[in-house]
Regions:
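Conserved pre-motif I regulatory segment
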Residues: 1-19
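Walker A/P-loop NTP-binding motif
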Residues: 8-9, 28-41, 58-62
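Walker A/P-loop
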Residues: 13-31
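Signature of the SF2 helicase/ATPase Hel1-core->accessory helical subdomain module
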Residues: 37, 53, 58-61, 141-142, ...
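A substrate-engagement module of RecA-like helicase motors
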Residues: 40-168, 175, 266, 296-303, ...
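A contiguous, basic/glycine-rich beta-loop/short-helix subdomain that forms a polymer-engagement track
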Residues: 135-170, 181-189, 299-425, 432-439, ...
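Conserved RecA-like P-loop NTPase helicase motor core
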Residues: 422-432, 486-596
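Conserved helicase motor "Helicase C" RecA-like lobe of SF1/SF2 P-loop NTPases
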Residues: 457-485
């Protein structure tokens, strides 16, 4: 109720509000009810498509019906979520289409295309979100033909945008919001001026999402896609009018040469790029590769310009060539001040330049000039900081002048949950630490009968702990180990959630990164969460380094003002996976002795819910045994 009243007042008073609403508060209904009752147009934005679908498909319809309001709603995603009818048709005839098995998937999509109304690929049963077919049947800003497209009238993206412009409540996601802010392409730009009330759920992801989109990037993947599209379109529609093989080959060769400059030395890393050349690379070779790339793109642009009147495909390809050349030129020059530049090394290269935060961009929209109408923008999440001002969120988002509210959880954590810090594990930096964590986790999971999630701070630890746990239970008919990456995230969570009920086997899930947040496994399926280390940001990450330097230059402390708040928020998010309902019970284990012995440990422990502290391995085992005896799996769901 406290949050609902605050949101209602912010809407009436036309001012921005930041709300940290802990698990169990009823955050979604607390902002939806006052927003719907306002009678105004409302924009809702979430961090994930999963919550976007939940809001549009479940929460909004239920409330609109309960309140008996004549409200129309619409769902708007990025163009990559919708089937492109033109590209689907082209894919069937493209010689470069993936292996034969992909043709079966394409056939299913073609069959579904005849009956779908929305064209939202999330509605197609059995389509793996990682399917290699998806890029062939969806459009990007770069390859969309726009109004000249032969399928323009039936376009699912345009239909979704028209519905959004006509609706009273529109549900979007943060990626779409910032993509539009960067290039004004998604349709949100037309929507925002008509909306006074905007609500950002899962707002803790706004800053990191925003810096991705408000910066610039160029990848070898983009270059190879362009090269492939130019070759296919040139041979199909303008054969003989230019040497499309040579033009395409030159761009492809330049992209691969750029990748070869880096070689195999830095797999999966981000290279600092503070001067003309990324760290560790040969300056002359790097400059030469960029120069060759720029020349190949210019030649492609010139050739495409001569045939642009023949078909809309060539107009868009000509624009893409110019955009890619502009980005190549940008990265051949010194970086702009106030941002950070780096090189991501993987199967492809990604050249990135980004702002350090989104403060200016958000503040300009939330606090408009006096002559413009004041806006009621609401920002909410279960985790927005570890101080009363929620500085971790408000400072980088330009919201230090916004009103702030923190609403505590109604859960009785002292009764429902306990946490433990093991004393005898190797230090976090010791190479033996991951194996020791896995051995301890195996013992605890065996005692509990599964129902365990191990959250790691790095992908390396994910692999080490995952491999060790799988080896521990390799011959066990009573326990299975699921490791992130083995299947799509949603399928992995569902398998973990249902393991005990349907298979009669215990289950341990080992995961990293995105599994620290947004995972909801209530009841007995999850009763033990193990965190391998304190989740400090990686100190050698270029963005982390740049933010640290900025703080130090301003007289602050990078550790106290950046690393600790980041760790506190991440720890709070990870711990939040444990207790999701008033009937849940469980144990949190943090396998990092620094939490108990370092002075900053007290600050990090204050970020955790007020759980009972277990002081010995014996107490932990007693608690796990108690959970086993009082398992509530036979209770009806609440």
């Amino acid at each position: 109720m406290e949050m609902a009243v605050a949101v209602s007042r912010a809407i009436e008073g036309a001012y921005p509000l930041v709300v940290e609403a802990s698990t169990g508060v009823g955050k979604t209904f607390s902002y939806l009810v006052p927003a719907l009752l306002s009678g105004e147009r409302v924009l809702l934005s979430t961090a994930t498509k999963a919550l976007q679908d939940q809001l549009f498909g479940r929460d909004l319809p239920a409330l609109v019906k309960a309140l008996q309001l004549p409200v129309s709603t619409a769902l708007l995603k990025g163009r990559g979520s919708y089937l492109c009818l033109h590209r689907m048709e082209m894919a069937r005839h493209d010689a470069g289409f993936p292996e034969r098995s992909a043709l079966r998937t394409l056939g299913k999509i073609e069959e579904w295309a005849r009956v779908t109304v929305s064209g939202d690929l999330a509605e197609l049963p059995g389509l793996d979100e990682r399917s290699p077919v998806i890029p062939w049947v969806t459009s990007t800003r770069e390859n969309c033909l726009g109004a000249p497209c032969p399928k323009f009238r039936a376009c699912h993206v345009n239909h979704a945008r028209r519905e959004a412009l006509a609706a009273d409540v529109v549900v979007i996601n943060h990626h779409l919001f910032f993509a539009d802010m960067a290039v004004r392409e998604s349709g949100v730009a037309e929507l925002l001026p008509t909306v006074r009330i905007a609500i950002f759920d899962e707002a803790h992801q706004l800053n990191e999402t925003g810096v991705q989109f408000l910066g610039k990037n160029l990848s070898t993947g983009q270059l190879l896609d362009f090269s492939r599209d130019m070759l296919a379109t040139g041979l199909q529609l303008a054969r003989g009018l230019a040497d499309w093989q040579a033009l395409s080959g030159a761009t492809e060769h330049a992209a691969r040469e750029l990748r070869l400059v880096v070689g195999q030395a830095y797999p999966g890393s981000k290279l600092r790029w503070t001067d003309a050349t990324p760290e560790g690379l040969h300056a002359r070779e790097w400059a030469g590769a960029l120069s060759s790339l720029l020349a190949s793109l210019q030649a492609a642009s010139d050739a495409l310009g001569t045939v642009s009147e023949m078909a809309p495909d060539f107009v868009r390809l000509h624009e893409r060539a110019a955009e890619l050349a502009e980005r190549a030129l940008l990265f051949s020059r010194a970086a702009e001040s106030g941002g950070v530049r780096w090189l991501e090394v993987g199967a492809q290269l990604r050249l990135v330049e980004a702002p350090l935060d989104i403060a200016k961009s958000i503040a300009a929209r939330v606090f408009p000039p006096a002559q413009n109408a004041a806006k009621s923008w609401i920002f909410t999440s279960a985790t927005l900081g570890d101080d009363e001002k929620l500085s971790w969120f408000t400072q980088p988002c330009g919201l230090t002048e916004a009103r702030v509210l923190r609403v505590g959880s109604p859960f009785d954590y002292a009764r429902q949950a306990a946490f433990y810090i093991p004393k005898n594990l190797p230090k976090p930096g010791d190479p033996a630490h991951p194996v020791a964590v896995a051995a301890a986790a195996a013992d605890w999971a065996r005692r509990l009968g599964g129902r365990t999630m191990v959250l790691t701070t790095t992908l390396r630890a994910l692999r080490s702990i995952g491999d060790a746990l799988q080896a521990s239970f390799e011959n066990s008919p009573d326990m299975q180990v699921l490791v992130q990456g083995a299947m799509p995230k949603r399928a992995l969570i569902e398998r973990f959630r249902q393991a005990d009920q349907h298979e009669g086997r215990g289950c341990v899930l080992v995961a990293s990164a995105s599994f620290w947040e947004g995972i909801d496994v209530p009841g007995d399926a999850l009763q033990l969460v193990i965190i391998d280390k304190l989740p400090f940001p990686p100190p050698n990450d270029p963005m982390v380094e740049a933010r640290s330097r900025l703080l130090e230059a301003a007289g602050g402390s990078a550790f106290n003002d950046y690393f600790l708040p980041e760790a506190a928020v991440a720890l709070k998010q990870g711990a939040g996976r444990l207790i999701r309902r008033e009937t849940d019970q469980g144990v949190l284990v943090i396998c990092d002795s620094r939490l108990a012995i370092m002075g900053y440990g007290k600050r990090l422990m204050r970020a955790l819910p007020p759980m009972q502290r277990l002081v010995s391995e014996e107490e932990l085992c007693e608690r796990l045994d108690l959970l086993t005896r009082t398992c509530t799996k036979d209770r009806p769901p609440t």
